């Protein structure tokens, strides 16, 4: 639960950007931060406003870290001990699972605007773009709490993956039928499930690895790998549009990835004879 709250609040940054950036881009503060840039429709965009806005919480965070954050004493570990996590198959399996959760969250956050502009150009979406990331980040602590409640992060992850699979199919159906309510509703369900997966899968890692030092290393490493979703998912969508003039092939790839994650989660962590209770 604590990990979920910490990461969930951090993930809210994506939602806050989507909510505030459209407002800040059109706010004329040229007397303070310089002139705007000409946009395609003849208006002015003040890109620098977003950077200056985020300077305020950044400075505040630095002050709070300086005043209140502690460096906890830890026993020294040899390089061999650190590198040992890369020889453990569970490190890579958890990277796969967490990428399906957090990688999808951050990737869909980055790509949703592109999808709407391509498939539903008649929809004014800028001020609603924050909803998906907001739901995904807000539900992350609940995923960790549920995993603690039923004593099984793998079970929460597995159920969420099945629902995520169904939501992905519904998103594709919404695109093919040109139904924005179906598309957007299914996408919000996708974001909701990524929150559950993120919180529950993070709970799995300490139970799989046992050693607190190794658990912390794997937690950081899986998060770093999963963050590539912000790059890969928009690239997959872009490739599908440029190669096939359709987003469907991209969703076929993502659906196959979700199915593979379901199999991995069940086989290694949730089936009766898996040998690991997490």
Where are these regions (language model features)?
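C-terminal membrane-cytosol helix-exit motif in multi-pass small-molecule transporters
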Residues: 26, 54-75, 264-268
């Amino acid at each position: 639960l604590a990990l979920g709250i910490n990461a969930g609040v951090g993930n809210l940054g994506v939602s806050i950007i989507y909510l505030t950036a459209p407002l800040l881009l059109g706010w004329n503060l040229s007397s303070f931060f310089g002139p705007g840039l000409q946009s395609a429709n003849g208006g002015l965009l003040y890109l620098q406003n977003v950077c200056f806005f985020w300077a305020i919480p950044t400075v505040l965070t630095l002050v709070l870290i300086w005043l209140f954050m502690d460096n906890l004493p830890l026993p020294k570990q040899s390089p061999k001990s650190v590198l040992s996590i890369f020889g453990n198959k569970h490190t890579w399996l958890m990277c796969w699972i967490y990428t399906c959760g957090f990688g999808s969250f951050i990737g869909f956050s980055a790509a949703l605007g592109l999808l709407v502009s391509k498939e539903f150009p008649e929809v004014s979406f800028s001020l609603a773009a924050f909803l998906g990331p907001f739901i995904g980040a807000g539900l992350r602590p609940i995923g960790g709490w549920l995993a603690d409640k039923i004593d099984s992060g793998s079970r929460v992850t597995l159920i969420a993956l099945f629902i995520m699979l169904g939501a992905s199919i519904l998103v594709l159906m919404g695109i093919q039928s040109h139904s924005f309510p179906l598309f957007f509703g299914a996408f919000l369900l996708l974001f909701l499930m990524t929150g559950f997966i993120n919180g529950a899968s993070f709970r799995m890692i300490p139970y799989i690895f046992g050693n607190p030092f190794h658990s912390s290393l794997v937690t950081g490493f899986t998060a770093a790998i999963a963050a590539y979703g912000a790059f890969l998912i928009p690239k997959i969508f872009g490739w599908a549009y440029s190669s096939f003039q359709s987003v469907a092939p991209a969703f076929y790839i993502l659906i196959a990835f979700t199915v593979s994650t379901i199999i991995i989660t069940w086989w290694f962590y949730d089936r009766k004879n898996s040998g690991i209770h997490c």
